[in-house]
Amino acid sequence: MIEFDNLTYLHGKPQGTGLLKANPEDFVVVEDLGFEPDGEGEHILVRILKNGCNTRFVADALAKFLKIHAREVSFAGQKDKHAVTEQWFCARVPGKEMPDLSAFQLEGCQVLEYARHKRKLRLGALKGNAFTLVLRDVSNRDDVEQRLIDICVKGVPNYFGAQRFGIGGSNLQGALRWAQTNTPVRDRNKRSFWLSAARSALFNQIVAERLKKADVNQVVDGDALQLAGRGSWFVATTEELAELQRRVNDKELMITAALPGSGEWGTQREALAFEQAAVAEETELQTLLVREKVEAARRAMLLYPQQLSWNWWDDVTVEIRFWLPAGSFATSVVRELINTTGEYAHIAE
């Protein structure tokens, strides 16, 4: 298995270094649900500004304040602890009376707004996230500047970030132990984290191998393509390659890579043979995913940060802003810019 730090770069390995997350204010995330609260219903959506706080810890504190069980509080996604984040939480509180959530107090947290909503906020139920990052002590301004320009055109590999694999790769190691021992895992959180890490690592490996080819955006026979921003896909045939290539070049279509699991992967012929070869040695993880009935899926190989802009405060400090769809990692963007330093550069929750 290719280590995360050794995954293939789209723009080549960065020439310089820089400090990421020198302080929480250097990594700002604003959650974009893509919808507004209904204004009625048995649930309450609460938007909270948090600084240096773990998502689960805030959810538990909110449940305690509302005097409800912790399972009655949900959120759309884990947010970085070592950052300033605006995040929505959802609490099931039936009844006509609206609790005074402005009275909720927790160090590092501030309630920004709240309103009733008809449906529970489920994991993954968000449109995306807006990021504002500050990179400090940049050693090669010219290299970073050119990379930002290139990313606007060519994007970055849509790798799952190092956070997905746990501190020191602990989630992936757990998945490997589970695969090797076949011992039942009762803890639902561990099951979820380990299976997710296994599938993410296989996806990253497929993308890394594809990037070693001459042109990662070259459509091959049997590729699974999806409309940009959509989840469904279709298979490319030899007769269509020229037209499909034009649509890929126009960013209308995205070439996908497999999220391996049970069932068909989605590719055929040349593309399927390539994907299978890319992870042929990772039989234990593949067997685990099939055994645990994790369905195979697809994910775009490349990621195009939207609304990308930047401002150099001086020759060694740059502020970068962009928006990413749900499930994408800001650290996978930064990885193509600089070799990051800093205690929390790769750490999330």
UniProtKB/Swiss-Prot annotation:
Substrate binds at F27, N129, F329. Residues 155-303 form the TRUD domain. InterPro entries: PsdUridine_synth_cat_dom_sf, PsdUridine_synth_TruD, PsdUridine_synth_TruD_CS, PsdUridine_synth_TruD_insert, TruD_catalytic, TruD_insert_sf, TruD_pseudoU_synthase. SUPFAM superfamilies: Pseudouridine synthase (SSF55120). The gene is truD. GO terms for cellular component: cytosol. Keywords: Isomerase, tRNA processing. It catalyses: uridine(13) in tRNA = pseudouridine(13) in tRNA. This is tRNA pseudouridine synthase D. The active site is at D80 (nucleophile). Its EC number is 5.4.99.27. Belongs to the pseudouridine synthase TruD family. One of its GO terms (molecular function) is RNA binding. NCBIfam families: PRK00984.1-4, tRNA_TruD_broad. GO terms for biological process: tRNA pseudouridine synthesis. Responsible for synthesis of pseudouridine from uracil-13 in transfer RNAs. CDD domains: PseudoU_synth_EcTruD (cd02575).
